[in-house]
Amino acid sequence: MAENLVNAFVTLVIENSDYEELDRIYLTNKVFALVGEGVADVETESSELIDLKDQLLQAGVKAGSVGELNEEQDIIGAQLMDLITPSPSAVNRNFWDTYKSNPEQAIADFYVQSKRNDYVKVKAIAQNIAYKAPTKYGDLEITINLSKPEKDPKAIAAAKNAVASDYPKCQLCMENEGYLGRINHPARSNHRVIRFQMEGNDWGFQYSPYAYFNEHSIFFYGKHEPMHISPLTFGRLLSIVEAFPGYFAGSNADLPIVGGSILTHEHYQGGRHTFPMEVAGIKEKVSFDGYSDVETGIVNWPMSVLRLRSEDKERLIALATKILNCWRGYSDEKAGVLAQSDGHPHHTITPIARRKDGKFELDLVLRDNQTSEEHPDGIYHPHKDVQHIKKENIGLIEVMGLAILPPRLKTELKDVEDYLLGQGNQVAPIHQEWADELKAQNPNVTAEEVTEVVRQSVADIFARVLEDAGVYKTNSEGLDQFKAFVDFVNLAD
């Protein structure tokens, strides 16, 4: 049954906040201030808060009181959803009051709030294409990321002409909490951060708006300081998995090519998700002198990973620190491993922490950011022949076996499917060689089979991408070279 749109929205705001019926006129005027009084007579049949918010924005655009750009609508939409969001102090008080008796419930409540107020973009995330496919390294996870709207040319032009601002300094800074937003910086009116302390310093815990996996979280330093992998990193990650039950925590590497997209602000990522790398077994056990109490092994994975397990956090931190320091100074010409050139360091680690079965676990992924004439984008980076699927940096999430692929692939892969079925010749030039190979391998593919054929091939290519990013190859020679590094660590003081 249809009812007034503004009235329906205000009713749900009252039901989902500390506002009361007496506040209805006040809230109605708040809504009019944001989307304009031209929406006053619009009706709706929806009963979902986020749908009503979207309808208010659309009605405002139609009435001319809300801008047409996604960025303009996001700014107003975040303010509308801020009406159901408690103040930062209330959010933190509720979190830590609940945490005292039930940490899992405190985390769950904050996650529910972050979805309810549309900070975590549940509707947008649902647009992503996601599937699993078997490979020789186990099932890999493939996602085509469609949740973030493409930049409108008008928005790009507007951002170019926008007044420069360095507030907030980046999208991870604490100052984003409640920030209105602008054409070139996301709206954050409905953003809330849980404060916590590590080593006597302020840190923040939030969810990622465009999550790549379940309860995708960000843990960020209170100060705007660059990413740096150090002994402190290992301790912090282990502290996080201890404080946030059921979550993993990991850090992107701190060097270009092998690092993530944000190197300017110290932060880690985590969440409640079991990645393919976590379930990968140990390819070969190794031992480190003086650490017989720590379980150690080389993981059966396309990238070069050492797994350490112990009940004692301090022992893990000590061994991980030794491995990091040795890796930063280690070169092996025959293996193509070089610690530095012209004063530029090439070696770092992508670390991942977990707590399982009463033990702490650290995966240390060895990274090398060398380039060469043959591989100008990176020797240990997706090579040219697989860049038609993935050419971006291999960061923390992909290291663990979840591919984040660009939106262009949605239509490009459909064109490849049509090509295999003989229903079209419009294949993007970057895919032509691959499409021809698939056609030769699957001459009689049917319409029922073709999507699976293409998806499986994409997963196989992603496995190759990870192999390219691996410093030591997965053959016997690569294993021997990896073990030579382990020997080097054992010889170090």
Swiss-Prot record:
PROSITE patterns: GAL_P_UDP_TRANSF_II. Keywords: Carbohydrate metabolism, Cytoplasm, Galactose metabolism, Nucleotidyltransferase, Transferase. One of its GO terms (cellular component) is cytoplasm. InterPro entries: GalP_uridyl_Trfase_II (IPR000766), GalP_uridyl_Trfase_II_CS (IPR023425), GalP_Utransf_C (IPR005850), GalP_Utransf_N (IPR005849). GO terms for biological process: galactose metabolic process. It catalyses: alpha-D-galactose 1-phosphate + UDP-alpha-D-glucose = alpha-D-glucose 1-phosphate + UDP-alpha-D-galactose. The keyword Nucleotidyltransferase applies. It is an enzyme of class 2 (transferase). GO terms for molecular function: UDP-glucose:hexose-1-phosphate uridylyltransferase activity. Its EC number is 2.7.7.12. Pathway: Carbohydrate metabolism; galactose metabolism. The keyword ATP-binding does not apply. NCBIfam families: galT_2, PRK05270.1-2, PRK05270.1-5, PRK05270.2-2. HAMAP family: GalP_UDP_trans (MF_00571). Belongs to the galactose-1-phosphate uridylyltransferase type 2 family. This is Galactose-1-phosphate uridylyltransferase. The lineage of its organism: Bacteria, Bacillati, Bacillota, Bacilli, Lactobacillales. The gene is galT.
